[in-house]
């Protein structure tokens, strides 16, 4: 490999996998009631350095559907990817791990959630697309405002 190729920025998804998945229907009585669910959706992301050039990025979602005051189902999915990240400016790393990689993972997470819910014999559940770039920028602004407020 030439020296120029060794210094070129590299960013690639090398492995995509479901790290954790569960689906629970606490009671069969939910199937006898009219379906008008209230959804509680919690989404989070995390990143872990595996070695100098590889990171595991994970998106986790927990969805709890309540119907007529009872839990209809709980679905918990963690979708992960191993990303090769090399020769990238250090100041770009938070954006890549906090927005770029989650944008890649989200469609797979969304599909896994929908599959679990429909296999549980509930109506389709398609999570609304998320703009992780905008979320990342908003988090930066909140952090900067908090720091300025302490000064």
Curated annotation (Swiss-Prot):
GO molecular function terms noted in the UniProt entry: unfolded protein binding
Signal peptide: none
Record InterPro entries: SecB (IPR003708), SecB-like_sf (IPR035958)
Cited Gene3D superfamilies: SecB-like (3.10.420.10)
GO cellular component, one term: cytoplasm
Chief subcellular location: cytoplasm
BP terms from Gene Ontology: protein folding; protein tetramerization; protein transport
Pfam families: SecB
Keywords of this entry: Chaperone, Cytoplasm, Protein transport, Translocation, Transport
Compartment list: Cytoplasm
Quaternary data: Homotetramer, a dimer of dimers. One homotetramer interacts with 1 SecA dimer.
NCBIfam families referenced in this protein's UniProt entry, alphabetically: PRK05751.1-4, secB
Function statement: One of the proteins required for the normal export of preproteins out of the cell cytoplasm. It is a molecular chaperone that binds to a subset of precursor proteins, maintaining them in a translocation-competent state. It also specifically binds to its receptor SecA.
Family statement: Belongs to the SecB family.
Protein's name according to its UniProt entry: Protein-export protein SecB
Organism from which the protein derives: Acinetobacter baylyi (strain ATCC 33305 / BD413 / ADP1)
Gene: secB
